[in-house]
């Protein structure tokens, strides 16, 4: 089952989430918004099994990456008012 993976702009480009993902759902892409010059991207969300290892690996105080499981609403994702 595919899950929604949202990557926020406070990503520091550390690659921890990419290395933690057992299914290679994530990859790094160029981005000028941080010192590392890259940020995580989730091009293969159809392979996401919702293990949330990427969330656990994220070192930022406010998670840069979130996995929203199938039953979670768009309101919990911050996509609705």
UniProtKB/Swiss-Prot annotation:
Pfam families in UniProt: Fer4_7
Gene Ontology terms for molecular function: 4 iron, 4 sulfur cluster binding; electron transfer activity; metal ion binding; oxidoreductase activity
Domain 4Fe-4S ferredoxin-type intervals: 2-31, 39-68
Reaction(s) catalysed (UniProt annotation): reduced [plastocyanin] + hnu + oxidized [2Fe-2S]-[ferredoxin] = oxidized [plastocyanin] + reduced [2Fe-2S]-[ferredoxin]
EC number: 1.97.1.12
Keywords, ordered alphabetically: 4Fe-4S, Chloroplast, Electron transport, Iron, Iron-sulfur, Membrane, Metal-binding, Oxidoreductase, Photosynthesis, Photosystem I, Plastid, Repeat, Thylakoid, Transport
Location in or out of the cell: Plastid, Chloroplast thylakoid membrane
Bilayer topology: Peripheral membrane protein
Residues reported in the UniProt entry to bind [4Fe-4S] cluster 2: 21, 48, 51, 54
Co-factor binding comment: Binds 2 [4Fe-4S] clusters. Cluster 2 is most probably the spectroscopically characterized electron acceptor FA and cluster 1 is most probably FB.
A single cellular component GO annotation: photosystem I
Gene Ontology biological process terms, A to Z: photosynthetic electron transport in photosystem I
Entry keyword Iron: yes
PROSITE patterns: 4FE4S_FER_1 (PS00198), 4FE4S_FER_2 (PS51379)
Organism superkingdom: Eukaryota
InterPro entries named in the record: 4Fe4S_Fe-S-bd, 4Fe4S_Fe_S_CS, PSI_iron-sulfur_center, PSI_PsaC
Cofactor: [4Fe-4S] cluster
Positions contributing to [4Fe-4S] cluster 1 binding: 11, 14, 17, 58
Entry-linked NCBIfam families: PS_I_psaC (TIGR03048)
Assembly and binders: The eukaryotic PSI reaction center is composed of at least 11 subunits.
Function statement: Apoprotein for the two 4Fe-4S centers FA and FB of photosystem I (PSI); essential for photochemical activity. FB is the terminal electron acceptor of PSI, donating electrons to ferredoxin. The C-terminus interacts with PsaA/B/D and helps assemble the protein into the PSI complex. Required for binding of PsaD and PsaE to PSI. PSI is a plastocyanin/cytochrome c6-ferredoxin oxidoreductase, converting photonic excitation into a charge separation, which transfers an electron from the donor P700 chlorophyll pair to the spectroscopically characterized acceptors A0, A1, FX, FA and FB in turn.
Stated name of the protein: Photosystem I iron-sulfur center
Organism: Cyanidioschyzon merolae (strain NIES-3377 / 10D)
Gene (UniProt): psaC
């Amino acid at each position: 089952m595919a899950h929604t993976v949202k990557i926020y702009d406070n990503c520091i480009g550390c690659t921890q989430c990419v290395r933690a993902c057992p299914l290679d759902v994530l990859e790094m892409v160029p981005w000028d918004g941080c010192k590392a010059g890259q940020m995580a991207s989730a091009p293969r969300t159809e392979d996401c099994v919702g293990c949330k290892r990427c969330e656990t690996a994220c070192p930022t105080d406010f998670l840069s990456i979130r996995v929203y499981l199938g039953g979670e609403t768009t309101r919990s994702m911050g996509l609705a008012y």
